[in-house]
Each structure stands twice: as structure tokens, then as C-alpha cells.
Amino acid sequence: MLSPKRTKFRKQHRGRMKGIATRGNSIAFGKFALQALEPSWITSRQIEAGRRAITRYARRGGKLWIRIFPDKPITMRPAETRMGSGKGSPEYWVSVVKPGRILYEISGVPESVARAAMRIAAYKMPIRTQFITAITSV
């Protein structure tokens, strides 16, 4: 699963997800992509589940790019712990995803295969997504 090798600080504020994605919202590497339509945190486990689903479906050929990285630590306190005594310890990592953000890109497979693979990955995501195609200028 994805996680940063090291960070400047162990813990982060939760933050807010206002507006739409201004970066990472267009296809850069592949021909087909899965785009987020809602704001959410996507965990490293969910990213990995989507990656596995796509690679299993499009087994021969095809290149996959993961366009999001979980760089935000989410803290949790132990169960049945009294209030106070500081913030909990980091438990898992999430990627902050805004509407319009590209999650996965794929190329080297037919559109029908890419569409089916992305649909399987979309079921693993906690948000609504859409399948998009790169505009090829000839």
C-alpha cells in the first residue's frame, strides 16, 4: 500500500474540501481515465484495491498510472479511551480528492476493456466517478 517514506510532521489537521480540483484534472499519460465527481478522502487501501482490480481485468498489455497519492495521515485514539490526553496516533493514510481529479489512467488496451476495468475499480471507490477519454488531435 502507498504511504510517504517520511514527512515533516507526524500529524495533520483534517482540513476542508472546498471547490473543484484545479490540478490533476486532465489526462496526462494514458488514453482513458477514471475521474472523481465528488469530494472525499480515499484511503491507501482503496487505491490499492482499485489498482488490483484494473490490473487483474486488463491482464495482458496495458499500462496503468495512479494519479493520486495518500499523503495525509489520519489519527485515531484507542477504543474506550477517555477524552483528552492529546491527539491520537496516525493509523492510516488518505489522499484528499476533489471533484474533477483524475484517479487512474490506462493505455494500451481497447476502450471496451478499459471501460470495464475502470467500472470494477469505480465500485471500490467511496465516491461517484466517470470514465473519460483523451482527446486525440490528429
UniProtKB/Swiss-Prot annotation:
Its main location: plastid. Keywords: Chloroplast, Plastid, Ribonucleoprotein, Ribosomal protein. SUPFAM superfamilies: Ribosomal protein L16p/L10e (SSF54686). GO terms for biological process: mitochondrial translation. The keyword Plastid applies. Gene3D superfamilies: Ribosomal protein L10e/L16 (3.90.1170.10). GO terms for molecular function: rRNA binding; structural constituent of ribosome. GO terms for cellular component: chloroplast; mitochondrial large ribosomal subunit. CDD domains: Ribosomal_L16_L10e. PROSITE patterns: RIBOSOMAL_L16_1, RIBOSOMAL_L16_2. It is found in: Plastid, Chloroplast. InterPro entries: Ribosomal_uL16, Ribosomal_uL16_bact-type, Ribosomal_uL16_CS, Ribosomal_uL16_dom, Ribosomal_uL16_sf. Belongs to the universal ribosomal protein uL16 family. Part of the 50S ribosomal subunit. This is Large ribosomal subunit protein uL16c. It comes from Physcomitrium patens. The lineage of its organism: Eukaryota, Viridiplantae, Streptophyta, Embryophyta, Bryophyta. The gene is rpl16.
